[in-house]
Amino acid sequence: MRIVALGTLRDFWKRHPDAEQPLKAWYDEARTAAWARPQDIKRHYASVSFVGRNRVVFNIKGNDHRLIVAVAYRFQSIYIKFLGTHAAYDRINAATVEDA
């Protein structure tokens, strides 16, 4: 998969060093994945949530942080829509946020 907005991940882990290794691991796994449908993601990430419009919520570092992406399965692309602490996630609408 092609991941759009890698800089968002880097900026976040500079502010939250505890998230660096989990985000790098997610990036490496997602980059080499070939997800064709939501079930492909769910097989690898059991705790993932789907919130409509091809949006996927990943728990990062044991649920301390949340990553919301939009997946364009047909184009094998992932667009980062939100990355924040769990507290920040609680204040947004995961289905519509565009704050990457």
Pin down the residues of each PLM region.
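Basic, Lys/Arg-enriched alpha-helical interface segments
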Residues: 1-64, 73-79, 86-100
